[in-house]
């Protein structure tokens, strides 16, 4: 008995950081009701991860208006995922440029998505927190809450902000735009468009 306990103690508790959505494919996709641009993803689209050449899972998140937003609804757009936290000063600095950047490229098929993974108390952000972020930084692009708990996959190192660029087929082309400044972000967007 003591050897069994010792073995369990040495192995420890390892959380399983996956969900049913990790293996989702396009056949499960459903249109969401919101005012953002939307296109049905191609048949056979499958989630594989957040690394270069992979397709992120179809995360369904709340926006600053309380509406459901699907990542895959932006299929056909070049998408920048700005993974931020409310308490993060560099994230706040970057947020001041979000709307200018989005508006400059929106007509070319670009979508800027801010995904807040934590509020000031390191909890999942509420719609009120999303709305405050959008208001404080004059963001009219989607501000989303990581309510499905992808934080450990989105920011495995805990370093905010993380900027992931997706091409028009939802494939990750850059898994961390660095340095995270507006000039560099714009250069990467222009390359992708």
Which residue ranges define each predicted feature?
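A short beta-strand-turn-helix
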Residues: 59-79
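Residue-level recognition of beta-strand->loop/alpha-helix junctions
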Residues: 116-118, 145, 176
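Conserved helix-turn-beta segment immediately C-terminal to the redox Cys motif
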Residues: 77-78, 93-116
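Short pre-active-site segment immediately N-terminal to redox-active cysteine/selenocysteine motifs
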Residues: 77-79, 84-87, 119, 159
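N-terminal targeting signals for export/organelle localization
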Residues: 6-58
